[in-house]
Every structure is written in structure tokens, then in C-alpha cells.
Amino acid sequence: MAQKENAYPWPYGSKTSQSGLNTLSQRVLRKEPATTSALALVNRFNSQSTAAPGQKLAENKSQGSTASQGSQNKQPFTIDNFEIGRPLGKGKFGNVYLAREKKSRFIVALKILFKSQIEKEGVEHQLRREIEIQAHLKHPNILQLYNYFYDQQRIYLILEYAPRGELYKELQKSRTFDEQRTATIMEELSDALTYCHKKKVIHRDIKPENLLLGLQGELKIADFGWSVHAPSLRRKTMCGTLDYLPPEMIEGRMHNEMVDLWCIGVLCYELMVGNPPFESPSHSETYRRIVKVDLKFPSSVPSGAQDLISKLLKHNPWQRLPLAEVAAHPWVRANSRRVLPPSAL
């Protein structure tokens, strides 16, 4: 059944491109992942013929004999292609497992989403949009989506595995980070978000729970609408993460990529202090403090970090420090110990 299901381009709606990352341009698909095994995961669908919704691939033979031969050699993934390991986390729409692709022995995080839950919440189009956004992104500090497939009941996302898990869990253990670690994270974030913004992608939800750690401790931005590891239930409201909301969103004004600048300012404060800057006993008080930018620093926060945070947490989005200047900030330059992972060298 899984093979037959995968003959269709997308389990919802009238999407006309074929399943997997075949929805992306060849230029994007040919960007080299970290390993040959990762490249194989990304390119699994490259030689398939295009099928319209409801068409079986076998019925679409107008692409020529070369493409047809390639299709026979590169079948869509099914769950049988993977060995499933321990659970990495649970989310509203499904679970995440450590997994290994049998042929290549390549380790991944396999996100399994239940169609029934997605349909119940009416978020089919959001899921499709978020998959396409993350699939286009290739940066050493962004968790990579290698591919996806589906069967009758589930949708599977094949994701890069981040061995050291959530940044949030490490922050819980240590309560605060030192200047070196915080500055390193700020440099990694500014670089990754600069890349995103150039591609017209706004994350909107930068927070410790959505930041993962690679083998060398390098930052990996995750959750472009869908968590990869176990999501936390803290700081949730129906309009997003309360403590990280910028003034323009609270006030119902139009927002743009400048919201990410506000978020990394809040994050920098939380990493240094142990709690968000506008955290209050009630939602209404938190809203009030955000709108007024009621920012107070404990004496433990060094002056350089205070300067950076103050320049990011501006009520007027256009007055916030640009990402290029975040990476070049004297405090970041003096303290960052950023080490690029092998895939970036």
C-alpha cells in the first residue's frame, strides 16, 4: 500500500509536483549535503517522472526512456527502508525517532506525523509550506530536511539528526550560559538567519526549545513550523510563544523579518540571565512590559552583552541592530568561539 500511496504527488490538495524533494529546483537538490549518504537521501526522487494528482507514475510516460529507466532505479522511500530506534520526542501531530536507512546505514531523525491529527487541526497546507521552506535551506546551522514520504496513515520527514539534542535542556541543567557560549550562539544565529532572510524566510519562533545541537555543539535551527525533537509546553499561547513575541505582533501590526531580530535579543538575555526579559506573573503584565520595552538587567550581565541586547530589543523594528552588525558586535567578536562543522569547511 505504501508504494501505491507514494505514486501520488502529495497526500492533500491539488499539488501538481511529485512527492519528495522533487518539488524543488534541480539547483537546490544538487547542493551537496554533509555526506554521500545524505546526498542519496536528498536525490532519491530526482529521476522520477512527474505525475499529476491522482495519476500513477506508470501512467505518465511522456518524459522519455532515460527518465523512465531512472525511475525504476530510484523508488520512493517507504518505512521498510528504515530501521527504527529509540524515540527522540513526541509532538502534537506525531513522534520523532532515531532511525537508520538500511542501504546506506545513514543515521537520521525520522519525524512521523499522523494524517488524522493533521486533518483534525486543518493544517495540511501549513505542513506542505513548511516542508518546502525547510527543504530549500542548506546551512551548517540549520537542521536539514533530507526528504519526505507518506503512506495511507502517516507522513514521514527524514531529518538531520542532532546528537546533543535541545539547547533548552542544556540551559535547564546549567540555568545560564557564560559569555563565550552565548556569544557563539549569537554569531551562529546571525549567520543562519541572514541566510534565511536572503531567501525570504522568516523563522518567527527562535527560542531555546527550537534550537538543537550537533555533534560538536554547533547550533542547528529547527522547527520551521514543526518541532523535530520533543517540544516544550512552556510559554505557549494561541498566538505563539508569549515571552518572545515582539511589540508589533502584540499590537496587531504588520511584521517582517525584523521579528527575528527581536527574538534573538530575547534569547541572548535568557541565555545570560536564565529567564526571558519580560517574564511576569500574568500574560497581561508580560504584554505591557513587551510593548513598553521594560528592560532591566541584573548586575551579572556584562556591559557588552547589555549593549547588544538593548540594540536588538527596540520597539521600532527598523531601529533594531541588523544581523550583520550582530555578528560584528565587539562583545560577540571578543567572546565567540564558533567552530564550523565539517560540512561547512
UniProtKB/Swiss-Prot annotation:
Annotated ATP binding sites: L88, G89, K90, G91, K92, F93, G94, N95, V96, K111
**PTM text:** The phosphorylation of Thr-237 requires the binding to INCENP and occurs by means of an autophosphorylation mechanism. Thr-237 phosphorylation is indispensable for the AURKB kinase activity.
Question: Start and end of every Protein kinase domain?
Answer: 82-332
Any idea which GO molecular function terms this record carries?
Answer: ATP binding; histone H3S28 kinase activity; kinase binding; protein serine kinase activity; protein serine/threonine kinase activity
The UniProt regions of compositional bias labelled Polar residues, in chain numbering, are 14-25, 60-77
Report one GO cellular component: condensed chromosome, centromeric region
- Tell me the residues on which Phosphothreonine occurs: T35, T237
Tell me what reaction this enzyme catalyses.
L-seryl-[protein] + ATP = O-phospho-L-seryl-[protein] + ADP + H(+); L-threonyl-[protein] + ATP = O-phospho-L-threonyl-[protein] + ADP + H(+)
Q: Which PROSITE patterns match?
A: PROTEIN_KINASE_ATP (PS00107), PROTEIN_KINASE_DOM (PS50011), PROTEIN_KINASE_ST (PS00108)
Query: Is Lipid metabolism a UniProt keyword of this protein?
Result: no
Active site: residue positions: D205
InterPro entries from the entry? Aur-like, Kinase-like_dom_sf, Prot_kinase_dom, Protein_kinase_ATP_BS, Ser/Thr_kinase_AS
Which sequence positions carry the modification called Phosphoserine?
S62, S232
| Activity regulation, short description | Activity is greatly increased when AURKB is within the CPC complex. In particular, AURKB-phosphorylated INCENP acts as an activator of AURKB. Positive feedback between HASPIN and AURKB contributes to CPC localization.
Tissues of expression: Expressed in testis, intestine and spleen. All of them are tissues that contain a large number of proliferating cells. Expressed during S phase, in a cell-cycle-dependent fashion.
Quaternary state and interactors: Component of the chromosomal passenger complex (CPC) composed of at least BIRC5/survivin, CDCA8/borealin, INCENP, AURKB or AURKC; predominantly independent AURKB- and AURKC-containing complexes exist. Associates with RACGAP1 during M phase. Interacts with SPDYC; this interaction may be required for proper localization of active, Thr-237-phosphorylated AURKB form during prometaphase and metaphase. Interacts with p53/TP53. Interacts (via the middle kinase domain) with NOC2L (via the N- and C-terminus domains). Interacts with CDCA1. Interacts with EVI5. Interacts with JTB. Interacts with NDC80.
* PANTHER family with a match to the protein in the record: SERINE/THREONINE-PROTEIN KINASE IAL-RELATED
What biological function has been recorded for the protein in this entry? Answer: Serine/threonine-protein kinase component of the chromosomal passenger complex (CPC), a complex that acts as a key regulator of mitosis. The CPC complex has essential functions at the centromere in ensuring correct chromosome alignment and segregation and is required for chromatin-induced microtubule stabilization and spindle assembly. Involved in the bipolar attachment of spindle microtubules to kinetochores and is a key regulator for the onset of cytokinesis during mitosis. Required for central/midzone spindle assembly and cleavage furrow formation.
Tell me its family.
Belongs to the protein kinase superfamily. Ser/Thr protein kinase family. Aurora subfamily.
Name of this chain's protein: Aurora kinase B
